[in-house]
């Protein structure tokens, strides 16, 4: 059976532009990158994180003062990969706005919340889900014990990130993330994950 990612990439449209040197073609994502738009779609894993981090660093080098827009539609994924993106978002000089289209679950919700203050958005029918990290380990009892300690440390760190960006107390975050907690866009706004639910581009431009 063909990999669905390969199928999707084969269907990526090309955009043709006229330049002084003739025609030039881009895949649609490269063309949007010229407009400082990055797409974070699908599971968060190391390869995807590397691409997103590279694009963030490239856009910083192009113009360290101009905003970068990160569009998120992700079910979440690997915590370490997500934290690599998070750290890069905080590291670079340009403000990073975030917009959830579709869903932002697990690490996707953390990256949505990590956008620049007053620049975190979601579309009306998007879905956001937060929860504590999970893991499955096997091996010697002492190794399982070490992994358990590490995942608890990771849980505390993720909770602290939500506290920082959502304006909630640590106890509120811990209670909400204890199980899978699904939110509508309006509920995410009330919880502090986003700053505005938007229905048109004019709403975004009005806040810039």
From Swiss-Prot:
Which Gene Ontology biological process is one annotated for this entry? protein quality control for misfolded or incompletely synthesized proteins
Tell me the keywords, alphabetical order: Cytoplasm, Hydrolase, Protease, Serine protease
Catalytic reaction annotation: Hydrolysis of proteins to small peptides in the presence of ATP and magnesium. alpha-casein is the usual test substrate. In the absence of ATP, only oligopeptides shorter than five residues are hydrolyzed (such as succinyl-Leu-Tyr-|-NHMec, and Leu-Tyr-Leu-|-Tyr-Trp, in which cleavage of the -Tyr-|-Leu- and -Tyr-|-Trp bonds also occurs)
Q: Return the InterPro entries for the record.
A: ClpP, ClpP/crotonase-like_dom_sf, ClpP/TepA, ClpP_His_AS, ClpP_Ser_AS
Q: Which residues cross the membrane?
A: none
Would you say which domain of life the source belongs to? Bacteria
Gene Ontology CC: cytoplasm; endopeptidase Clp complex
Its annotated compartments are: Cytoplasm
Does Protein transport show up as a keyword for this record?
no
Catalytic residue positions: 106, 131
SUPFAM superfamilies in alphabetical order: ClpP/crotonase
Main subcellular location of this protein, as a coarse class: cytoplasm
* E.C. designation(s): 3.4.21.92
GO MF annotations, alphabetized: ATP-dependent peptidase activity; ATPase binding; serine-type endopeptidase activity
Q: Does the keyword Transmembrane helix apply?
A: no
Q: Which family does it belong to?
A: Belongs to the peptidase S14 family.
Q: What does this protein do?
A: Cleaves peptides in various proteins in a process that requires ATP hydrolysis. Has a chymotrypsin-like activity. Plays a major role in the degradation of misfolded proteins.
Subunit and partners = Fourteen ClpP subunits assemble into 2 heptameric rings which stack back to back to give a disk-like structure with a central cavity, resembling the structure of eukaryotic proteasomes.
- What name is this protein filed under? ATP-dependent Clp protease proteolytic subunit 2
Please tell me the species this chain comes from.
Rhizobium meliloti (strain 1021) (Ensifer meliloti)
């Amino acid at each position: 059976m063909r990999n669905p990612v390969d199928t999707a990439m084969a269907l990526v449209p090309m955009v043709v532009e006229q330049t002084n040197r003739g025609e030039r073609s881009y895949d649609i994502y490269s063309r949007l990158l010229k407009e400082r738009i990055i797409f974070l779609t699908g599971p968060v894993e190391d390869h995807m994180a590397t691409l997103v981090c590279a694009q963030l660093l490239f856009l910083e080098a192009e113009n360290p003062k101009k905003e970068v827009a990160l569009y998120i539609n992700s079910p979440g994924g690997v915590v370490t990969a997500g934290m690599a993106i998070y750290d890069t978002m905080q590291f670079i000089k340009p403000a990073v706005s975030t917009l959830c289209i579709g869903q932002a679950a697990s690490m996707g919700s953390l990256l949505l919340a990590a956008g620049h203050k007053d620049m975190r958005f979601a579309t009306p029918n998007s879905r956001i889900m937060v929860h504590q990290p999970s893991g499955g380990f096997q091996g010697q009892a002492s190794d399982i014990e070490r992994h358990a300690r590490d995942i608890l440390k990771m849980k505390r760190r993720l909770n602290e990130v939500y506290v920082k960006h959502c304006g909630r107390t640590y106890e509120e975050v811990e209670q909400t993330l204890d199980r899978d907690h699904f939110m509508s866009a309006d509920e995410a706004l009330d919880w502090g994950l986003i700053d505005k639910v938007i229905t048109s581009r004019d709403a975004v431009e009005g806040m810039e």
